[in-house]
Amino acid sequence: MEMYETLGKVGEGSYGTVMKCKHKDTGRIVAIKIFYEKPEKSVNKIATREIKFLKQFRHENLVNLIEVFRQKKKIHLVFEFIDHTVLDELQHYCHGLESKRLRKYLFQILRAIEYLHNNNIIHRDIKPENILVSQSGITKLCDFGFARTLAAPGDVYTDYVATRWYRAPELVLKDTSYGKPVDIWALGCMIIEMATGHPFLPSSSDLDLLHKIVLKVGNLTPHLHNIFSKSPIFAGVVLPQVQHPKTARKKYPKLNGLLADIVHACLQIDPAERTSSTDLLRHDYFTRDGFIEKFIPELRAKLLQEAKVNSFIKPKENFKENEPVRDEKKSVFTNTLLYGNPSLYGKEVDRDKRAKELKVRVIKAKGGKGDVPDQKKPEYEGDHRQQGTADDTQPSSLDKKPSVLELTNPLNPSENSDGVKEDPHAGGCMIMPPINLTSSNLLAANLSSNLSHPNSRLTERTKKRRTSSQTIGQTLSNSRQEDTGPTQVQTEKGAFNERTGQNDQISSGNKRKLNFPKCDRKEFHFPELPFTVQAKEMKGMEVKQIKVLKRESKKTDSSKIPTLLSMDPNQEKQEGGDGDCEGKNLKRNRFFFSR
């Protein structure tokens, strides 16, 4: 109840209270039925039964259940708010409803009863208080606390149901083998009250009601009279024998001809002789002068208008005795005038709209001007992207969480199966984030190269080394000799060891900083990195080598300075081989540096 603001009390009954409330976030006015906290199991049974039926059956002439929750051990049912009933109409029109209004109301009430009976449901409490009337004139049947399915042959029902004034004779005599005709009897009593403004069988006890039934409707059948004679409640009571008119119009003179025929078909003492709701809808009272053909479009327009205004949220089930929502969707039975069920307008329709809007946004994001351009990714990343795309096309992804995160960076495949984007800085990240292509030190990189083909980079590095070596040879060409070959080899080995040691320090330092989990280390996929940084480092090391050679040239004779241009080709190939090994070590260290 924290989400709702109480505005007042609407009604109160033997099983609970109905409050008028306002949703604090949306401002929607709702009616909340609060069941009393009683030790009897009957209260929970009635609440559970009403929840079950309202979840399972939806119709435009049945009240809509919005939400169910339990607070302080009390069950709360949230309904659409309609504060007007047929009883309020009768209090306003003391002499009964006008004929046009009465026919429209009865047509909708019969449609609701027919829908329930076609699904083998008995309401068992039809009365003016349980017929809601909206501002546009749409009637909705409510209060399903006594509703239940038809029993199998041999099963029995509860004997004390329905309000006394509208109770059929088999219910008064506590016959447990009743069925749909009890609703038809209650409808007949209510029709007379709606037409005249006065209840037809007001009574203070079951005996009083039974006496009035015999006087106004007819004598008991042999089966019912046998139950009456054996009942200890009516022991010693003798019912009168009354002669009644045979025609309906003489029996109910206050009603017009066709309406009297409907009431006479409903109020039959024998349940087997009572008419059905389907036959009543086909009666001349509704089919004459094209009433149905004219009223159906009007009713459809009113339903569409109310559906736009009252787009209710689908109930969030917090009641432990409720069935799962997935099972509910399979068992919902509808019978509507619309192309869809107006009772289901709400979260399901909003979810479909969000799905369509999401598709439009995805199309716009792919074809817009501000998109990130597509780049060539390694093959293993392409596989992950295709798999993620296939997963996103499943309907369950839209039902659970729309993958809006894909629009921000469509090139980033670091998303789990639920469409939730993972933190790229977390230790469990599966793939490194993309490289910023605008960095100044990456302008010379080849973005289309692959990690599986490092030969091109080694070739470029070898060319750079040769170019720098030739520069050294041109500078010192007048003072080189072949005698000091071992000295030059030792110098190069020292420089190589120095570079390797520096790279090892850099890689070990990066290992300590990153501190990735061991279990995830083998599953990292590293993106393509250029070779520019290492090329610059090697260039700096060669400059240092030049300075060392210059200092040695000043101390030694010119005859002892080696010449790089006149080196042996075999020795150059050997150095190239060492360079390849060196390049592999640098490549391995570069991976740790990139991490």
From Swiss-Prot:
Q: Which Gene3D superfamilies match?
A: Phosphorylase Kinase, domain 1, Transferase(Phosphotransferase) domain 1
Is Phosphoprotein among the key words of this record? yes
Annotated Gene Ontology cellular component terms: cytoplasm; nucleus
Q: Which reaction does it catalyse?
A: L-seryl-[protein] + ATP = O-phospho-L-seryl-[protein] + ADP + H(+); L-threonyl-[protein] + ATP = O-phospho-L-threonyl-[protein] + ADP + H(+)
Phosphotyrosine modification sites?
160
Q: What keywords are assigned to this protein?
A: ATP-binding, Cytoplasm, Kinase, Nucleotide-binding, Phosphoprotein, Serine/threonine-protein kinase, Transferase
Report a single Gene Ontology molecular function.
protein serine kinase activity
- Give the Polar residues compositional bias ranges: 387-397, 468-491, 499-509
Renumbered ranges of motif [NKR]KIAxRE = 45-51
Domain of life the protein comes from: Eukaryota
Q: Where is the composition biased (Basic and acidic residues)?
A: 368-386, 570-585
Q: Which residues carry this modification: Phosphothreonine?
A: 158
| Domain Protein kinase: start-end pairs | 4-286
Enumerate the active-site residues: 125 (proton acceptor)
Sequence similarity: Belongs to the protein kinase superfamily. CMGC Ser/Thr protein kinase family. CDC2/CDKX subfamily.
Its protein name is Cyclin-dependent kinase-like 3
- What gene codes for this chain? Cdkl3
